[in-house]
């Protein structure tokens, strides 16, 4: 009987995968360094302790880094990152990178690096830096989405579009304008002022 049930369950799973139905996962890391990757479903990825890398794919995903110097990525170069994401870094110097959809990004305590979307899309994201000296980049190509940024305590630096809504607690703000080439030049100039330590470990993805 148990073999029959197992066989039927295996057949059902095979049919779901073959039909393209997205299956969600829940993955929880350890107190050491972990790499957790999502699926095309709605996933929950929890890093816990250690310097973790959490990578979302399609689906409405929730990523929680926990303690440590974590990297949270709302989508990779190999997928379209469909589905709104919620990314929470937690304590530690985290890198929180949004995807193509309207994401909610929260870095937590620590000196964090945040980007609203690697793909420069025109959706609206909500970003919260938390405590610490954060670096936040929310520029997009036109038509830009109206991103909402709260920096929190600490000395924070923000690169933004004219449409973005920035809280008064963002200490150093630079607003870019002009053509895409001009925006790229301004962005490169701005990044040159950021300490290299903010970008250490990004090769883990």
Task: Identify what each model region corresponds to.
Residues 1-4, 9:
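Positively charged n-region of N-terminal signal peptides that target proteins for export
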Residues 8-17:
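Bacterial N-terminal signal peptides
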Residues 29-32, 38, 47-49, 56-58, ...:
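Glycine-centered beta-turn/loop sites at beta-strand termini
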Residues 113, 135, 190:
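Thiamine diphosphate
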Residues 138-139, 143-181:
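Leucine-rich solenoid repeat scaffolds
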Residues 183-205:
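Composition-driven, intrinsically disordered low-complexity tracts enriched in small residues
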